[in-house]
Amino acid sequence: MSCISSQCFITIKSICIVLLLSITCGAVSANSNYGEALTKSLLYFEAQRSGKLPLDQRVIWRGDSALRDGSDAHVDLTGGYYDAGDNMKFGFPLAFTTTMLAWSSVEMESQLKAHQEHGNTLAALRWATDYLIKAHPEPNVLYGQVGDANLDHACWMRPEDMTTPRPSYRIDPQHPGADLAGETAAAMAAASLAFAPSDSAYAKTLISHAKELFEFAKDYPGVYHNSIPNAGGFYPSSGYEDELLWAAAWLHRATGDQTYLDHLTQASNSGGARSVFAWDDKFLGAQVLVAKLVFEGKVKNEGKMIEYKSMAEQFICNCAQKGFNNVKKTPGGLLWFLPWDNLQYTATASFALATYAKYLEAAQTSIQCPNGDVLQASDLLNLARAQVDYILGSNPKKMSYMVGYGTNYPKRPHHRGASIVSIKNDPKPVTCNGGFEAWYNNPKPNPNLLVGAIVGGPDEYDAYGDERSDFQHGEPDTVTVAPLLGVLAAIA
């Protein structure tokens, strides 16, 4: 069967790109190839796409999936990203992923352009924001999940022909979720900054949604998993104050509106010195954004504003082992936060370090840590670089924790789509239990290379087993790769 010539060209070009990117570059050393890792991190997002895939899709083992999402609610909820190694669309981590993709794009724009990856970054971001726009059909309605998480996790099926139920879950005034609405507002506002130079109309649309969602979050307090209990066992929320601060900080940066700055100034809780920066804890992100305002002289270096800045710097000093409550390190030098999926916290901490280094350099200032030591911008960037080097292979196991980077990387990440033969190679349906029998329990490497994925990482003693069943250490997710993308751009 013949095809339109342009489509054939795109397909051939895509195959060539993927083949080239799958060729490894030899043993990993301290001299990591950050540009290569940056390129591959963006490919990971293409592997996580849900919905109708575009003609320029570069990860060719994936196919269209979940094309009826939202039909139960008579809303188009196709698109977006699967959060990790399952076939779920969880709105809470998806919104945080979107915010971090946007922050990476805004903060590291020149570096991304220098490596010819700015366009791919905006494409990854737009795949998320297009979905979030559809998920917000009314001012006080936001769809926060597609799929039954318990039923999804009970099956091992690729997304292209999964048969698990796809119910849609939403928050509204009767079923509030200020954390989910606030995080989505932050995502929309941050993304508006990324798109403003190239698509002002789209940026205005995003700002409009962000403003509505912020008001929705303020007017109807509460944690979202009380309204969407199905999410509670997977992405439970610890509160919503941080999301409101985070959203206010991004809306102020995007609009300059004093209203949002007032929210930051009048907030009763600035978060204190945080122990992590993650999908459930955005206090540090808000603190870093306020510190930027202080450095630039846009707010006075006093009161609540200096409190935000001081708390951000306490976190940084703790990462640098010069604070009151230093972050633990593995024997190999990895910042160690929590046993489950530790690299997500390493990635976000490294992003905070790299971003704060940029702010310090621009202000020609430094950080005075509690032990009396002074941290320069270069110290922060060097620490972030050391963490990336560890992730890319400069560690006791000499293993890259980015799939497809180097020669020694995880071959069995906990990921349904990657671990099951591509539907393009074998269209025979994979059943719920059949997937476990034929693929999950198969000791062989995954048949599809999940290029650019970052697994959960080693344990606190630098050990890693590369077992598909070890989801605590072996499952990649979007909330890790989005911030790491920004760090890679900063140091490439």
From Swiss-Prot:
It comes from the Eukaryota. Its main location: secreted. Keywords: Carbohydrate metabolism, Cell wall biogenesis/degradation, Cellulose degradation, Glycosidase, Hydrolase, Polysaccharide degradation, Secreted, Signal. GO terms for cellular component: extracellular region. The active site is at 86 (nucleophile), 414, 466, 475. Its EC number is 3.2.1.4. Coiled coil: none annotated. This is Endoglucanase 15.
